[in-house]
Amino acid sequence: MRSNSIFTKEIDSEAVKKSSNLRPPSTGSSNSNGSDTASPKKKKKGFFRSLFGSSSSGSKSCGSPFTRIWLEYFEVSLRKNDVDHFRPGYWILDTNIDFFYEIMLRQVLLKRPKEESQQIYLLRPAMVFFLAQAPNPLEIESALPPAMFDASFIFLPINDTNECGIESGSHWSLLVVSVEKGLGWYYDSMSNGNTNDCNLAIKNLGILLKKEFRVRHMKTPQQINDCDCGLHVCENTRILMYRLLQKPYVPKVDMNLDHSVVDSVRLRKALMEVITSLLAAYGSKVPKPSETHTDPEKDKKIFSKICKTEELLELPTLSAVTSDSAQPHSLPASMPSSQPQSRSESLPLTHPNSEPNPKLDSQPNSSPVRRPSLIKVKTASTSVLPTSILQRPPSIVPRPETAAIQHTQQSIEIH
C-alpha cells in the first residue's frame, strides 16, 4: 500500500525540487497515521529467500544489500527492499508500480504501432503525486512528461499521501482519464478510499489540459486484506490497457471491472519470477550497458505470465485492416488464460468477448468506407474463458458494509 520511495527519485526540474524534499531510501518499515497497522515481514524459505538473502531486519548501512541496486530494468531500479515488497504480506511501494508500468510500456505499448501506443500513457506514481499536490499545476508543467499531453487515455495510480519527506500514504487506487470525453473512471479496491486525492489529481490535470473532467466511480473487485491495493492497481491497469488497445477494432470498449478477478497471490509470484528470470538472463542491468535493447525471444518467455506477449503479437494493427469484404471478428476483451491447476494459481483475467455491433454488421460489404471493426483476425482457441473462471470467487466478494456503498455503474461506450 505505502508509497515509501517516491522521494528517492531524482527529477531534474526546479519546479519539482522547490515543491518537495528529497527523501532518504526507505527502511522498509511502515508507520501509518491511519488505522492500518504495519504488515508483518513474513519470512519464506525456498528459492527466493536463497536468492535475495535474509529477511529485511537489522542494520541497513549505505553499503548493505538493502540499499544497493539489485536490478535495473530500463528506467526503473529495484533495491532489496523493493523486491521484498513483492512478497506476500507486504505493502506495494511506488517503485513496485513503476516496475510493473515499465514492463507494460516495454513489453506491450512499445510493441504496438506508434499511432496506437501514443494513445495510452502510464503516468508514474511520483508524477501523479506532484500533480495532485501542486498548488499551481502550471508551475510543474515542464516537469511532466511531454508524451502525456498527446495521449488520449492517461492512467494515474493514486496514493492518499499528502506529506513530503516522511513515510506516508496507506492506500492505492486507479484513475483512468479519457481526454477526448472529458471523463475519468475511478477504480478503488476499498470503496471508502481516497476520493479526495482522485479529485485533486483530475482537477489539476484539467487545468493543465484546459479541459473540465467528470469522474465516474466504477464497480471494482474489493481486496480482502490491507496490503493488496497496489496489486489491484497493477492488474486493473493491465486489463483496461488491453481493452483500450482493441479500441480501433471493436465498436465498444467496456470499462467496467465488476466481473474481473484479481489473484494477488499469483501476481506476486509472477513478478518475483520475472525478477529472477531477468537476473538469470541479463544480469543486474537490463539491457546490458553494451546493448540498446533486449532479446525478444528471452522476453517472450520471461514476461509470458504477466503480459502474454504472444497474444499481443497476434493482435491486428491499423495496417492489417483488409478489404471491405472481410468478415467481422470480435477481439477478446482480455487475454486468454492457460488451463489453471487451481484457482489460486490462475492468472487474473476478465470479461468475455465483446458483442459485435449489429448496425455495422448489417451494412453491405460493398460500402466504400473502411471500417476498422471489419477485419480478419486469427483468434486464439482459448480466447473464451471457462465460466468458472469468469465468475468472481467467494474470496473476493465484498463484505456487506463495503458492498452497500459501492456505486452502480453501467458500461461506458467509447467511440
UniProtKB/Swiss-Prot annotation:
Modified sites of kind Phosphoserine: S35, S367
Top-level EC class as recorded in UniProt: hydrolase
E.C. numbers: 3.4.22.-
Composition skew (Low complexity), residue ranges: 26-38
Molecular function (Gene Ontology), one example: deNEDDylase activity
Predominant localisation class: cytoplasm
Region (Disordered) location: 1-42, 320-415
Keyword ATP-binding appears in the UniProt entry: no
Protein purpose: Protease that catalyzes two essential functions in the NEDD8 pathway: processing of full-length NEDD8 to its mature form and deconjugation of NEDD8 from targeted proteins such as the pcu1, pcu2 and pcu4 cullins and other proteins. Has a role in meiosis.
Protein name: NEDD8-specific protease 2
Organism: Schizosaccharomyces pombe (strain 972 / ATCC 24843) (Fission yeast)
Lineage per the UniProt record: Eukaryota, Fungi, Dikarya, Ascomycota, Taphrinomycotina
